[in-house]
Amino acid sequence: MLTRRSLMGSATALALFMGIAAPAFADPDAALAKLQETVLSKGPSGEDPSPASDVVLSDEELAKIKEMGATAAIVMHYGGNDWSQAQINGLQTQFGAMGIEVIAVTDAGFKPEKQVSDLETIMAQSPDIIVSIPTDPTATAAAYRAAHEAGAKLVFMDNVPTGFVPGTDYVSVVSADNYGNGVAAAHLMAKALGPDGGEIGLVFHAADFFVTKQRYDGFKATIASDYPNITIVDEQGIGGPDFSGDAEKAAGAMLTSNPNIKGIWAVWDVPAEGVMAAARANGRDDLIITTVDLGENVAISMAQGGFIKGLGAQRPYDAGVVEAKLAGYALLGKDAPDFVALPALPVSQDNLLDAWKQVYSTEATENVKASMQ
């Protein structure tokens, strides 16, 4: 699905609302360094973020949890990327340390009806805990409500079902600084374009999905407020489930309609792969691409000095660990913060291998290492 947005969007309005009278050039390197010291995102209902470092379980609390013999299910929106696998790895590792058995891991393929079915199937096993990310906050709300009313303790990644109240309907929500990662991708785009700037395009997620909208808003507001030498000339949305294929079509249309485009931002790594394919098909080896999420394919491109010049990375493994600990809070009856966020991680070729360790808690793959120039 392709949709096109007006080029005067909410992010420009946000920049004006924040009192930015006239854009002034930013120093991308200084802005990127400062970004890692704070969290810019708010929670789904406007909650202030709590730091992940505050979520801790004592040895005594861990011992109590182990005695419970609790079970958990992980209900994913989509399992086909490195981010999802890292979340699952973090969850399984921490649940194992807590003596909690993971009885199911599901992949909805970004289809709300499949996720509803997954939840119904899982509830037949009566898990004590469900950790999940809703594909659609409205379409899945009734299924999550039924799980909550049946006694499952809910911890969410990134997004929450419509009408759910923290501390009442669910334990907590954990997220990366998605607004901050959009900001990081904008500064990295500006750095790669250089002082002359130029025309760019955006490939956004055309869905009611809180975190991808935050990335879009962060990227667009930063370009509007900090880089008057950069002009967004085209935007197209993708709805999936073939996000790479949809992005290839969207980017191809952009490059045909706007031959002077120097760069394209993609909302996460899988669409960025489609943008790379479009660049190759259109003979645009000079195209600059920035994105969010450190997947292996975009990391290989970055390592090779290819299309991907920079990205804002989440910390999905660490997020999974925090989500499991928050589930432990619920088992203990311990008060949990409403919204926990991990700071953005700007990634370029210079820090790629170190960033991989931070994101995945493991060494970079051999494919990434072998691609480093």
Name each model feature, range by range.
Residues 10-11, 221:
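A periodicity- and composition-biased signal for non-globular, repetitive helical segments
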